[in-house]
Regions:
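C-terminal/domain-edge helix-coil "capping" segments
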Residues: 18-49, 150-159, 163-218
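Extracytoplasmic/secreted envelope proteins and their assembly/folding machinery
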Residues: 83, 87, 91, 95, ...
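C-terminal motif of bacterial Sec signal peptides marking the signal peptidase cleavage site
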Residues: 14-16
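Extracytoplasmic/periplasmic, Sec-exported soluble proteins
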Residues: 54-57, 75-86, 90, 150-156, ...
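N-terminal segment of the mature soluble domain
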Residues: 55-117
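Surface-exposed short loop/turn segments
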Residues: 96, 101-169
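N-terminal post-signal-peptidase region of extra-cytosolic proteins
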Residues: 39-50, 79-80, 98-104, 147
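Sec-dependent N-terminal signal peptides
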Residues: 4-12
Length: 218
């Protein structure tokens, strides 16, 4: 059984009713051709602003995980309560893994402080494929396959965008996207639970915390 998931190190959204405005303000347009394959992770795509040196930062400010909603404000296969639970779990787990790696956690913007922002951008169901497909979203939008019927196993794709910012100026430093493959499948009529998402977050948080720690100054 397989479930394909896209999860990123970080992307921009600051929550609540301000989601729409914040997306257009924070996520400046960057063509997918500007992203390069990561040397350490072939499934990861990275955009880095020219001249940026992450070693000048030695603390991180972790924003809450947010969700880009559909026009009707509803998620496909995920309830609002589960969204809140997933958001809290993401924040606590990622912060814990960062601390394990020796990364200092800031509580406010400041010099040498990097802001990490993350948001889930889309859910999609597709028929299983033996090859991991390119899951990079072409735009910031929900993309749900609505014509799926029956109880055949389907792969779940969870899209996310990512960015690291200077905490004081808001300048974009790095944006990251990556495709991950888990070991489960789902069916269209089975709701995706917070517990299933937490297993994915555990793996992601540990690997991304180490990756970030390796690139920051100490």
């Amino acid at each position: 059984m397989k479930k394909v998931v896209m999860v990123a190190v970080a992307a921009a959204l600051l929550g609540g009713c301000a989601v729409k405005n914040q997306v257009s303000h924070s996520l400046q347009a960057i063509p997918l051709t500007a992203f390069q394959q990561s040397e350490s992770n072939p499934n990861q795509r990275v955009y880095k602003e020219p001249g940026v040196d992450l070693r000048q930062y030695n603390e991180v400010l972790l924003d809450p995980l947010q969700f880009i909603r559909q026009e009707n404000g509803q998620w496909y296969l995920l309830t609002a309560n589960e969204q809140n639970q997933i958001g809290r779990y993401y924040h606590d787990k990622f912060q814990s893994e960062l601390i394990k790696q020796g990364v200092k956690i800031a509580t406010a913007p400041g010099p040498k402080v990097m802001r990490i922002q993350a948001a889930v951008t889309n859910f999609d169901l597709t028929r299983p494929d033996p090859k991991l497909r390119d899951l990079l979203p072409a735009k910031i939008a929900i993309n749900v396959t609505r014509e799926v019927i029956g109880k055949e196993p389907y792969l779940l794709k969870v899209g996310s965008m990512a960015q690291l910012l200077d905490s004081r100026s808001g300048k974009l430093l790095v944006r990251v996207m990556d495709a991950r493959e888990s070991t489960d499948t789902t069916h269209k009529d089975e709701p995706i639970t917070a517990e299933e998402m937490e297993e994915m977050i555990d793996q992601w948080a540990a690997s991304r915390a180490k990756q970030l720690a390796d690139n920051l100054g100490r």
